[in-house]
């Protein structure tokens, strides 16, 4: 029992004995939480040399003075790794080294007379054993003065390329970088247009491209400012309210008539054109000047200039042309507007519908009339010959009448004003006769 107790008391000393000769790496950086109870040595006099910060050597240490590593550039002797003591060479002599020559029977060799210092061949520190060094062989160095300037020029070009490849700091480009001078990225020059550090100091193409983009953005902002200045006092001709001062933000939009320059808000002009108690030629005309406009263009700003209005109309048509037509339905249906439809007529495979020629015939007054009403006359003749019809037939008739109305709306854009009025008069007469006879 006594022997076991003695062994147990001696065990900790044996286990912790070798650790006291090893310096605590946490204590070296001031982070050891064990304190005096640490089983490693806290004696800095016996520790190795402090580690050198590799980021400081590259010039991009983000910690600065607070870095735990040493901020000193090592000398050339420190860069070469420490080697073990050189052992005597027992193999054949190296190439380029003279063989020992004896002076006499009892004399010493020439190699033994040379000191073991700088004159001796240090094969451990040879170029092929140093990491990262190119192999140069053991031949004697040859001095040449020619390639010196060329090497300097290549070094300058390499440094210039490295400078070009540096990326701009994303934080400094949008505001402020918290790293300041210790930032690993490049802080660009301040742009006079946007006031941000986004100009690369040495990349001229990037500077010109950014300045050009800033000028374009500034021009767009100026156009928007002029549009707001032009639109802020415009008053709707129906509700007599300033469009930009409406209570509901969704109603602060203009309804631009295609053939008229009078100002209306989009809600009022759409309500005017959807009225049922007036004739179509009345609701399609301007409430003030009575000029007929085939469509209304929604706009956030007021547009009065002819060129700007044409650009707005073309932009509106291009935007509508990207949406598929629900009447065409990818070729499964028929669009009453035909080639005059603003929406996209495309088949499932992506092919666009080819415009079909419109069949026309001459009327009694010498003007061309659309033959699309013939289907309605056939329908009326069929209803006259039949006795009565149920609700399904009535719904079908209403559908045919609505389709005929859409056809006439589309056809009215091709004819002049007088011809369009004749079309509408004839259509209303057909409707009156039909409702008097059957409904």
Curated annotation (Swiss-Prot):
Write out the entry's keywords from A to Z. Metal-binding, Repeat, Transferase, Ubl conjugation pathway, Zinc, Zinc-finger
The protein's annotated pathway: Protein modification; protein ubiquitination
Region: Makorin-type Cys-His; residue ranges are 191-218
Any one GO molecular-function label of the UniProt entry: zinc ion binding
Reaction catalysed by this enzyme: S-ubiquitinyl-[E2 ubiquitin-conjugating enzyme]-L-cysteine + [acceptor protein]-L-lysine = [E2 ubiquitin-conjugating enzyme]-L-cysteine + N(6)-ubiquitinyl-[acceptor protein]-L-lysine
Q: Does the keyword Zinc apply?
A: yes
According to the record, the residues making up region (Disordered) are: 73-118, 352-371
Superkingdom of origin organism: Eukaryota
Q: Which CDD domains match?
A: RING-HC_MKRN1_3
Q: Give the Enzyme Commission number.
A: 2.3.2.27
Q: Which protein is depicted?
A: Probable E3 ubiquitin-protein ligase makorin-1
| GN (gene name) | mkrn1
């Amino acid at each position: 029992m006594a022997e076991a107790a003695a062994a147990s008391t001696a065990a900790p000393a044996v286990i912790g004995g070798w650790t006291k000769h090893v310096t605590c790496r946490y204590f070296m950086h001031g982070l050891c939480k064990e304190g005096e109870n640490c089983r490693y040595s806290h004696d800095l006099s016996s520790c190795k040399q402090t580690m050198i910060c590799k980021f400081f050597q590259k010039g991009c240490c983000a910690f600065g003075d607070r870095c735990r590593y040493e901020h000193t550039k090592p000398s050339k002797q420190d860069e070469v790794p420490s080697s073990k003591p050189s052992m005597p060479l027992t193999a054949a002599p190296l190439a380029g080294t003279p063989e020992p020559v004896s002076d006499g029977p009892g004399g010493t060799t020439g190699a033994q007379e040379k000191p073991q210092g700088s004159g001796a061949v240090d094969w451990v520190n040879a170029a092929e054993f140093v990491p990262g060094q190119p192999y140069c062989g053991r031949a004697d160095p040859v001095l040449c003065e020619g390639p010196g300037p060329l090497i300097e020029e290549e070094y300058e070009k390499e440094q210039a390329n490295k400078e070009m490849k540096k990326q701009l700091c994303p934080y400094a480009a949008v505001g402020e970088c918290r790293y300041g001078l210790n930032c690993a990225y490049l802080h660009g020059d301040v742009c006079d247009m946007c006031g941000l550090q986004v100009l690369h100091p040495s990349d001229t193409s990037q500077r010109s491209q950014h300045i050009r983009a800033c000028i374009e953005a500034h021009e767009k902002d100026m156009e928007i400012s002029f549009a707001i200045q032009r639109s802020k006092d415009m008053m709707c001709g129906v509700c007599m309210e300033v469009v930009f001062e409406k209570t509901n933000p969704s109603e602060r939009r203009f309804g631009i008539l295609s053939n008229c320059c009078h100002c209306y808000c989009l809600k009022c002009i759409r309500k005017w054109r959807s009225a049922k108690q007036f004739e179509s030629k009345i609701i399609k005309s301007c409430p003030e000047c009575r000029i007929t406009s085939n469509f209304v263009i929604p706009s956030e700003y007021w547009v009065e200039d002819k060129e700007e209005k044409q650009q707005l109309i073309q932009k509106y048509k291009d935007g509508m042309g990207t949406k598929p037509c629900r009447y065409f339905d990818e070729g499964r249906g028929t669009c009453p507007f035909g080639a005059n439809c603003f929406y996209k007529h495309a088949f499932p495979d992506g092919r666009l519908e080819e415009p079909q020629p419109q069949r026309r015939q001459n009327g009694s007054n010498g003007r061309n009339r659309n033959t699309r009403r013939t289907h309605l006359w056939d329908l009326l003749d069929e209803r006259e010959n039949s006795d009565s019809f149920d609700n399904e037939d009535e719904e079908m008739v209403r559908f045919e009448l609505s389709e005929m109305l859409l056809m006439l709306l589309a056809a009215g854009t091709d004819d002049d004003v007088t011809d369009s009025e004749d079309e509408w008069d004839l259509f209303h007469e057909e409707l009156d006769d039909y409702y008097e006879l059957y409904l």
